[in-house]
């Protein structure tokens, strides 16, 4: 998955280069790195033929694969120093939110509460929970994992809100873990977020923490065409 991710990243960045001969020059240089990588990037850019490799200043030397150059392989399964966002609304289950927050903080994460109104929301126990951020201005991109805890009515309301749908859809697309209770399912459905091992029931705090410590790399080929 890491090679596909790298090739797709090169395609993404080079697609922003408007000058064709510059794109071709870079792909030509990639041939000195790896012929297969160059071909995948060329295909992703829609090139009909692989550009020629420029003369190498020094003859390329093949070296054995180094774990030190990996990203996924070196990624530590941890929540320490990371941040979990919990989306709530009026009527959200107080006990579920408390359990998720406790589990995330015990794992070393910071927890931020997100609500439609920055003033917070009144939970199922009748108490007002202040928010750290307003939903429209606090997208899931700022979190390492998210939880969505909503009442049935709250889920129906937020399933019609673009910011809420984007909150879960972007987290899913960025391969992040998502915890969701029954009320949140309406929002997930609106965002076309399906179940996988990284989308867990909000009551399963242990499963959520385990999933939140990493990214769901197996999800990526199901979401986008990789180079």
Predicted regions and their residues:
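ADP-ribose/adenylate-binding Rossmann-like module
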Residues: 174-181
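Extended, subdomain-level signal for the structured scaffold at the beginning of enzyme domains
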Residues: 4-173, 186-227
């Amino acid at each position: 998955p890491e090679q596909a991710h790298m090739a797709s990243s090169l395609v993404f960045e080079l697609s922003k280069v408007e000058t064709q001969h510059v794109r071709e020059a870079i792909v030509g240089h990639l041939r000195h790195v790896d012929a297969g990588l160059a071909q995948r990037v060329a295909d992703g850019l829609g090139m009909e033929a692989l550009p020629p490799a420029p003369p190498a200043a020094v003859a390329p030397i093949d070296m054995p694969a180094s774990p030190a150059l990996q990203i996924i392989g070196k990624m530590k399964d941890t929540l320490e120093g990371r941040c979990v966002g919990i989306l709530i609304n009026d009527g959200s289950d107080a006990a579920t939110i408390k359990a998720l927050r406790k589990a995330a903080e015990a794992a070393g994460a910071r927890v931020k509460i997100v609500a439609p109104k920055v003033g917070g929301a009144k939970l199922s126990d009748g108490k007002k929970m202040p928010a750290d951020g307003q939903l429209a201005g606090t997208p899931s991109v700022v979190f390492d994992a998210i939880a969505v805890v909503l009442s049935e009515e709250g889920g129906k309301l937020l399933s019609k809100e673009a910011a809420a749908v984007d909150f879960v859809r972007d987290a899913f697309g960025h391969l992040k873990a998502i915890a969701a209770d029954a009320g949140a399912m309406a929002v997930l459905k609106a965002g076309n977020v399906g179940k996988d091992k990284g989308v867990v029931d909000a009551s399963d705090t242990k499963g959520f923490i385990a999933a939140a410590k990493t990214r769901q790399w197996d999800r990526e080929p199901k979401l986008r065409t990789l180079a």
